[in-house]
């Protein structure tokens, strides 16, 4: 199995090993576009893999901070009480770059490591718009879609993030 993320189409495709499309999901990548620099709030490009799966067994809309469940469940009322919070919900697929000097380790411009940038595929509030850029660098998904995807992909599943 492998995953392909299209930034232009704002989709995440789950593919069989032979390339057959198994499922396609609407997602939201970075509002600031693509890039590999820490602090840029951009979605990194290139070859990645799922390094860690976090949140198995957590309820839908479980809130995560620093990859740990807070015990909170997202509601519109909780969101109103924390207006600037970047909501990471339900499950986390933590990505690691596979291309040294591009999205892993260091480049001539400095650190470019996707994992050290804490780039995830994660759940979002149902009010978050999918199908157009809006994240701070991560790949946002609908919670129900992420629960489905999480159950199908093991750690080390390849993830290709492309601009097309």
Language-model regions, residue ranges each:
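Extracytoplasmic
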Residues: 7-9, 22, 45, 88-90, ...
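N-terminal post-signal-peptidase region of extra-cytosolic proteins
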Residues: 1, 26-40, 72-79
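Short, surface-exposed secondary-structure junctions/capping segments
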Residues: 34-53
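Well-ordered beta-strand positions in beta-sheet-rich domains
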Residues: 24-26, 47, 118, 158
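Short, solvent-exposed loop/turn elements at domain surfaces
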Residues: 14, 35-36, 58-61
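Soluble periplasmic/extracytoplasmic beta-strand elements of cell-envelope proteins
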Residues: 4, 13, 49, 92-94, ...
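Exported/periplasmic cell-wall-interacting domains
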Residues: 58-164
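A structural motif detector for short, solvent-exposed N-terminal "entry" segments of globular domains
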Residues: 1-33
């Amino acid at each position: 199995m492998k995953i392909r993320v299209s930034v232009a189409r704002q989709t995440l495709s789950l593919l069989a090993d032979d390339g057959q499309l198994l499922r396609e999901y609407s997602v939201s990548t970075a509002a600031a576009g693509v890039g590999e620099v820490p602090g840029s709030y951009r979605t990194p490009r290139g070859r990645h893999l799922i390094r860690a799966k976090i949140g198995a067994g957590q309820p839908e809309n479980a809130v995560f901070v620093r990859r740990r469940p807070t015990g909170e469940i997202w509601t519109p009322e909780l969101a109103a009480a924390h207006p600037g919070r970047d909501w990471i919900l339900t499950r986390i697929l933590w990505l690691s770059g596979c291309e040294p000097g591009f999205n892993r380790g260091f480049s001539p411009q400095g650190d470019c490591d996707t994992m050290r940038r804490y780039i995830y595929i994660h759940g979002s509030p149902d009010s978050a718009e999918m199908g157009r850029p809006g994240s701070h660098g991560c790949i946002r998904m609908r919670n129900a879609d992420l629960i489905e995807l999480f159950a199908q992909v093991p750690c080390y599943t390849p993830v290709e993030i492309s601009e097309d």
